[in-house]
Regions:
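Short, conserved charged micro-motifs
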Residues: 17-19, 78-83
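Conserved beta-strand-loop-alpha-helix junction that forms the acyl-donor binding cleft
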Residues: 12-14
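Vicinal oxygen chelate
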Residues: 1-4, 28-76, 83-113, 125-128
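Conserved active-site tyrosine of GNAT-family acetyltransferases
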Residues: 18-25, 86, 117
Length: 128
């Protein structure tokens, strides 16, 4: 019945700050869409929609709180390269590299947080 995930939505206090961070730090591409100029961040065949907390015409989960997401991104880079890049941009790695099990099997992951506190995992299947 299901074949994949199209997008996820992050409830945000500061849309511009979040969009800027994901563009500059992770290299995601900003997309403005819809009549009310919603902001999404695209990468590969996926996207993250940034929803302002309190948006009246945009349905969301029952708890409208920033910093509650836990997202795993996949990289084809060596994690040592990713760590060096993130450190250069001032991002604190809070855990890793550590072994994890992803949807395709064993992977190695590092963890950091976005500006509003959501947990971001960056994983590689190529390091095992």
């Amino acid at each position: 019945m299901l074949v994949g995930i199209d997008h996820v939505v992050l409830n945000c206090k500061d849309i511009e700050k979040m969009a800027d961070w994901y563009e500059k730090i992770l290299g995601l591409e900003r997309e403005v869409f819809g009549a009310d100029n919603r902001i999404a961040l695209k990468f590969g065949n996926q996207k993250i929609n940034l929803r302002p907390i309190g948006a009246k015409n945009w349905i969301t989960g029952t708890k409208e709180v920033e910093g509650t997401a836990d997202i795993c991104f996949i990289t084809e880079e060596r994690l040592s390269v990713v760590i060096a890049c993130l450190n250069k941009k001032g991002v604190n790695i809070i855990l890793g590299p550590v072994s994890r099990t992803g949807s395709l099997g064993s992977m190695t992951s590092i963890y950091c947080r976005d500006p509003e506190g959501s947990l971001l995992e960056i994983a590689s299947y190529n390091e095992n």
